[in-house]
Amino acid sequence: MFRIVACPTAGSCGVMPGAVKAVADHYQLDKSTVVKGFLAASGIGNVVANRACVAGAVGGCQAEIGTAACMAAGAIVEMMGGTPRQVGHAIALCMKNLLGLACDPVAGVDEGACGKRNG
């Protein structure tokens, strides 16, 4: 039986692997390079999960999609041969663009998907 890994969550599970696959296919990267990207992404997700939250139900889409996008950015820089400092810069630039999204709840847990809340 295969396992499905939601990285970082089920609601954002297509962001990171989709971005990684697109880059890997475009640049014809080998499997070990892609694995290194996934390892870098797992470290990024681990830091966020231990210091903040990754659940959209708690932190809104900034937490869920933001973490996934940061994981993707870091993974791609790693796959392209970037330094750890460059990976960090990619994460920071990605997160800066996702902070303060207006769709997130001001004081609490969301009760429905963004489309329903903003619809």
Predicted features and spans:
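Alpha-helical scaffold segments in soluble metabolic enzymes
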Residues: 18-22, 36, 40-43, 71, ...
